[in-house]
């Protein structure tokens, strides 16, 4: 195929990894986003999903020249929505181009008319001057227009607009502007709703139309720390998971709790072959109805599957699952992959990795950040570390269950990062509860406090949901209180191991311990509120 010259503003088909070609537009990347080394790449914004990614030039094809070919090859719903978005974009651009041409011809007509009037006026002026030198009133045609409001005749004429097609083709790097547009027209023609494709060296940007320039550039920066860890971007499951190509590997899943149930459901929806096991077998029934197979023991699941995921409550449960009778270790053979998604301490995950690898297995830790709702929605954040080959083999699984994933390097790094995240979340929840109770005892409206918080810098879905739980007295578990307390305890121990103070986490931990003493362990973490009112 002959080389095609592509430039900023061109519409293209972009091929990313194992995913189908997707319609997009070549755009200028933010200044802080470094270009990948090696082969020539262009920065592409994809339609429909509004993902952004660096794509190798050889993986790009002109949109119009290959449109029929691509539409015949791909029939997914998300794909068709993306094509519709391109056509809508072109339709609007064509309308703007037509408006410009119409206004251009009107302007020429007005200029010609004005010129004729000017010449007539000149003749009249000269004639008048030759017959008399006395001052005369100017004719109505010669009267100067007032500055500001245009004459009535121009009222209904659309204002000239630059050609969108030409703007897209000719826009230079210096003229291409971030941040995202704020008007409805801009969002309609060049939407910056942000998701992400799985791309080495870039982070996921959360979908937030009002996101600031600083937030965009900060999140797009390549995250490559001194430890050599690299963040890896994954596709938003709401964006293109309708077109995920599921791996042909057999998937096993151990543990069908709050998080595991949502994960397995999404794996099945996206066409993966899944075998499940749970300590209480009844929990498997629903997934068997959805097409899953059932394993009698963890060892059986591991021995019959290529990649086995596990998501259990704590370090003890994680060890028992691997080392106990009919456990994972008994089913491990050379080449078998084991992915532990539990939130545990670095020492536990290192021990599990060692025993798995000693049997010829391959190990990846991949704890998840999120709650039951995010698990059900396929919007988890996955933190992975260990065998990078396993991480890549799990790509379609991670796309099904999460909105983004990060590969953080060697075993233990994901456990550390997960504990730090949950330490921050748990401490924040305790502070929310403390503020709500303080408002109550000082005679302030808790609802008004929430309304004010929702209008400020702390506004978030997490804040609103947890405060609503408190206001309604509804503590149905979305994230068990006993588990956030466990994570706080492990985070404090992590701080102790490196002689780092964690006084805020320690104080929050004591409040959660009091809530547990009040029989709140199996309620949502927001039930920590009750520790302040008893």
Curated annotation (Swiss-Prot):
InterPro entries recorded: 6-PGluconate_DH-like_C_sf (IPR008927), 6PGD_dom2 (IPR013328), 6PGDH_NADP-bd (IPR006115), GLYR1_PWWP (IPR035501), HIBADH-like_NADP-bd (IPR029154), HIBADH-related_NP60_sf (IPR051265), NAD(P)-bd_dom_sf (IPR036291), PWWP_dom (IPR000313)
Region ranges (Interaction with histone H3): 190-193
Keyword Nucleotide-binding appears in the UniProt entry: no
Biased composition (Basic and acidic residues): 93-122, 138-157
Ranges for domain PWWP: 8-66
DNA-binding region: 144-156
Residue positions binding NAD(+): 252-266, 343, 486
Lineage top rank: taxon: Eukaryota
Gene3D superfamilies: 2.30.30.140, N-(1-d-carboxylethyl)-l-norvaline Dehydrogenase, domain 2 (1.10.1040.10), NAD(P)-binding Rossmann-like Domain (3.40.50.720)
A cellular component annotation (GO) from this entry: nucleus
The entry's keywords: Chromosome, DNA-binding, NAD, Nucleus
Location of region: Dehydrogenase domain: 242-534
Entries under CDD domains matching the protein: PWWP_GLYR1
Molecular function GO terms recorded: DNA binding; NAD binding; NADP binding
Main location: nucleus
Region named Disordered: 93-168
Pfam hit, one: NAD_binding_11
UniProt keyword Nucleus present: yes
Domain notes: The A.T hook DNA-binding domain is required for the interaction with MAPK14. The PWWP domain is a H3 reader and strongly binds DNA.
Subunit comment: Homotetramere. Binds to mononucleosomes.
Family: Belongs to the HIBADH-related family. NP60 subfamily.
Function according to Swiss-Prot or TrEMBL: Cytokine-like nuclear factor with chromatin gene reader activity involved in chromatin modification and regulation of gene expression. Acts as a nucleosome-destabilizing factor that is recruited to genes during transcriptional activation. Recognizes and binds histone H3 without a preference for specific epigenetic markers and also binds DNA. Interacts with KDM1B and promotes its histone demethylase activity by facilitating the capture of H3 tails, they form a multifunctional enzyme complex that modifies transcribed chromatin and facilitates Pol II transcription through nucleosomes.
Name this protein carries in UniProt: Cytokine-like nuclear factor N-PAC
Gene symbol of the encoding locus: glyr1
């Amino acid at each position: 195929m002959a080389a095609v010259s592509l430039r900023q503003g061109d519409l293209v088909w972009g091929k990313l990894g194992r995913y189908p070609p997707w319609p997009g537009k070549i755009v200028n990347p933010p200044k802080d986003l470094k270009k990948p080394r090696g082969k020539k790449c262009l920065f592409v914004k994809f339609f429909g999903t509004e993902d952004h990614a660096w794509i190798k030039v050889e993986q790009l094809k002109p949109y119009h020249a290959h449109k029929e070919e691509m539409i015949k090859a791909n029939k997914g719903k998300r794909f068709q929505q993306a094509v519709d978005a391109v056509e809508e974009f072109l339709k609007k651009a064509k309308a703007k181009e037509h408006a410009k041409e119409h206004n251009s011809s009107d302007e020429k007509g007005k200029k010609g008319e004005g010129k004729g009037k000017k010449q007539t006026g000149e003749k009249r002026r000269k004639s008048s001057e030759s017959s008399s030198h006395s001052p005369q009133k100017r004719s109505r045609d010669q009267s100067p227009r007032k500055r500001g409001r245009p004459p009535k005749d121009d009222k209904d004429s659309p204002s000239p607009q630059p050609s969108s097609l030409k703007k897209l083709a000719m826009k230079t790097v210096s003229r291409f502007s971030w941040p995202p547009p704020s008007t409805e027209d801009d969002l309609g023609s060049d939407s910056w709703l942000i998701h992400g494709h799985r791309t080495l060296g870039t982070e996921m940007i959360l979908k937030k139309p009002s996101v600031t320039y600083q937030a965009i550039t900060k999140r797009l920066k390549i995250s490559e720390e001194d430890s050599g860890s690299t963040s890896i971007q994954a596709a938003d499951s709401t964006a293109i998971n309708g077109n995920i190509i599921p791996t042909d590997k057999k998937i096993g899943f151990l543990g069908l709790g709050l998080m595991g149930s949502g994960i397995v459901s999404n794996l099945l929806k996206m066409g993966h072959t899944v075998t499940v096991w749970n300590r209480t077998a009844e929990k498997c029934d629903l997934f068997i109805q959805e097409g899953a197979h059932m394993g009698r023991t963890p060892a059986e699941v591991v021995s019959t599957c290529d990649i086995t995921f596990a998501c259990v409550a704590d370090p003890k449960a994680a060890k028992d699952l691997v080392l106990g009778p009919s456990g994972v270790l008994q089913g491990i053979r050379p080449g078998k992959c084991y992915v532990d998604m539990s939130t545990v301490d670095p020492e536990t995950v290192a021990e599990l990795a060692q025993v798995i690898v000693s049997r010829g297995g391959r190990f990846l830790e991949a704890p998840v950040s999120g709650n039951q709702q995010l698990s059900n929605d396929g919007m988890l954040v996955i933190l992975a570390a260990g065998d990078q080959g396993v991480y890549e083999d799990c790509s379609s699984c991670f796309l099904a269950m999460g909105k983004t994933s990060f590969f953080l390097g060697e075993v233990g790094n994901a456990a550390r990062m997960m504990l730090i995240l949950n330490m921050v979340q748990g401490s924040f929840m305790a502070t929310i509860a403390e503020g709500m109770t303080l408002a109550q005892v000082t005679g302030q409206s808790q609802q008004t406090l929430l309304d004010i918080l929702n209008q400020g810098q702390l506004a978030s879905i997490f804040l609103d949901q947890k405060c609503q739980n408190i206001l309604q007295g509804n503590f149905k578990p979305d994230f068990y209180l006993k588990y956030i307390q466990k994570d706080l305890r492990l985070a404090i121990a992590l701080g102790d191991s490196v002689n780092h103070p964690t006084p805020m986490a320690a104080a929050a931990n004591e409040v959660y311990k009091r809530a547990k003493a009040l029989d709140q362990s199996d309620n949502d973490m927001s039930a920590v509120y009750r520790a302040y009112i008893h």
